[in-house]
Amino acid sequence: MGIKGSKPKLSKEDLEFLKKNTNFTEEQIKEWYKGFVQDCPKGHLTKEQFIKVYKDFFPSGSAEGFCEHVFRTFDTDNSGFIDFKEFLLAINVTSSGTPEQKLEWAFRMYDIDGNGTIDEKEMIKIIEAIYEMLGPEVTKSADDSPRKRAKMIFEKMDVNNDKELTLKEFVDGCLADKELFQILTNEVKK
């Protein structure tokens, strides 16, 4: 029973876990936590809050579809909320993770049904969501439709032609093709 209106505290266990499993210092973790609790006083982020934040970054498009996939990937315990630990682990991977870590994270997002592989339908759904989020300023010519883009990706990556991408095929394919890596991880050239 806490004091009414009191904000959740960062536990020592979570702090130690995040120090060991992220590239953030203790001070940075505490600073991130302070901002997180300020924005999410209940100590977790709902899907609705998450979508609202994403919409602010992509005002000309429809971010809801893509947000569903990103939210699912952040929410590793499938609680329907993103707690601070899940949030900071995802921020760490997406902002300062190795290429392999970023690709593993992207793979989990693309693997919509969670079966450990990505099929062409899953790839198309993600590409459609990305196009919707980016909005009308991104020209979607017939040559660059989600279906054609997915087919091109599978032609390059599906080594054994079983119509599914394993994590290894996905990572190896992206590491071998810088353009695909940038597209599939939303990585921008620095």
From Swiss-Prot:
GO molecular function terms noted in the UniProt entry: calcium ion binding
User: For Ca(2+) 2, which residues are the binding ones?
Assistant: 111, 113, 115, 117, 122
Q: Which residues form the EF-hand domain?
A: 24-59, 62-97, 98-133, 145-180
Q: GO biological process: what's one of them?
A: regulation of signal transduction
Q: Where does Ca(2+) 1 bind?
A: 75, 77, 79, 86
This protein's record includes keyword Calcium: yes
Q: Which domain of life is it from?
A: Eukaryota
Q: Where is the signal peptide?
A: none
Annotated residues for binding of Ca(2+) 3: 158, 160, 162, 164, 169
Q: According to its UniProt record, in which tissues is this protein expressed?
A: Expressed in neuronal processes in the ventral nerve cord.
Q: Which UniProt keywords apply?
A: Calcium, Metal-binding, Repeat
Note in the entry: Probably binds two or three calcium ions.
Q: Which family does it belong to?
A: Belongs to the recoverin family.
What is the protein's known function?
Neuronal calcium sensor, regulator of G protein-coupled receptor phosphorylation in a calcium dependent manner.
State the protein's name: Neuronal calcium sensor 2
